[in-house]
Amino acid sequence: DDSLTDKQLAWAFPVDRGAVLNIRDIEQGVENLNSVGQNKATVALNPGQDQGGTLVMLNNQLSRRWRGSVGINNNGVASTGEYQLDSNLVVDNLFGVNDSAFVSVSTNIGPHDLPHAMSRSYALSWSLPTGYWQWSLQNSFYEYEQTVLGDVVNFSMHGSSFNSSIQLGNTLYRSQTGKLDLSVGFIRKDSKNYIEDVFLETSSRVLYVWYLTTSYQHFLEQGTISINAHLYKSVPWLDSKRQLVSAEDDFQFTKYQFNIGYNTYFQIADQAVQYAMMADFLYSPKVILASEALTVGGRYSVRGLSQGGLFGYKGGYIRNDISIPLQTDWPWPGQVQLFAGIDAGLSNLPEYPQKRSEWVAGSVLGFKLYDRNFSISFSYARALRVPDFLQQKQQEIDFSVRFNF
């Protein structure tokens, strides 16, 4: 039906015409095609004209090659602006080889407590699957400006961070019930900070980081299990430094990260229920930079601990979520999702030498209204356990509105 070109098929499938049929190769090729959002490919195996031959039939439902969204949320902080506006765009098959390009922009909007505050972020990425290999390039840039209130005089601060990475992955093994991937990557991280246009050498750094990731995904009858192990190792190359001043410790680091995820679905009294669990653990043999350490508490770890939490380099957290999708007969929304979650996390405390470790817990309750082009979500998160030394809000209300085009 001309929805797939010969070039796309050649890049997607790790097979040659006339070769011995391997069903795993076919599955890999279909997965590569469907990694592009505009494709929805399925495969059927039919008898070939020659004895012992097989005809591989592909059917593809082709949709628009680009899509995007615009949204607003209140995930910022009061000092620099609680409300955030963001937009993103995805372009599929940019070079005609099943590749995808992604670009996003976000900025703070609305009132803020500081006299002047601006923050913006930009991201650009590109990915390409070919046979059993996967390539990806990622770039992100963040900049900020703000006026800080002093006891005598106000002063201005500004800065930026620019991260670039390249990754190469390979599917080492796949079966009917699972697959094993190995990837290696390299990251450059560059941060610059200024006070009154004076460069802050002690808080500005260039880091080069190698990483190695092993991922296994197991397909269940009603769900999946994913396991990921990461090794990160910084190296003092080129314009990076081991230390900025003689009194500072060597900030080159090695850290290990382990993630496990599980999701499934079941029914209770004819009502579909979805359950998801995610655990993330980090270990480093010595103190590492705050930007590379673990934060246990916040929207993306233990919910309910607003704008902060435990900081360390040995610990982790577990998140549990249950969601109930509901179909409606209303003109809008076509679908409603109710969700609830409970989280817990533990970390060592290098900022509090008298304490070895502490733990926190939190919860969330909310709903999402959505259809194909528009969605609204609302959630209320509350801390269930917070150590006395953490002086911060123990609840938060989040909302977001998003339009897809």
Regions found by a protein language model. Give the residues of each.
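Periplasmic polypeptide-binding modules associated with outer-membrane biogenesis and secretion
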Residues: D1-G76, S106-R120, M278-A279
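Predominantly transmembrane beta-strands of Gram-negative outer membrane beta-barrel pores used
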Residues: S69-N74, Y83-I109, R120-E143, Q167
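Transmembrane beta-barrel wall of Gram-negative outer-membrane proteins
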Residues: L114-Y216
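Transmembrane beta-barrel strands of outer-membrane/channel proteins
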Residues: L45, V70-N74, A101-T107, L137-E143, ...
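C-terminal outer-membrane beta-barrel translocator/porin domains of Gram-negative envelope proteins
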Residues: Y194-Q335, I342-A344, N348-P350, F389-Q391, ...
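Outer-membrane beta-barrel "beta-signal"
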Residues: L89, F367-F374, K393-F405
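Residues that define the transmembrane beta-barrel architecture of outer-membrane proteins
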Residues: G52, G81-L85, M118-Y122, S160-S164, ...
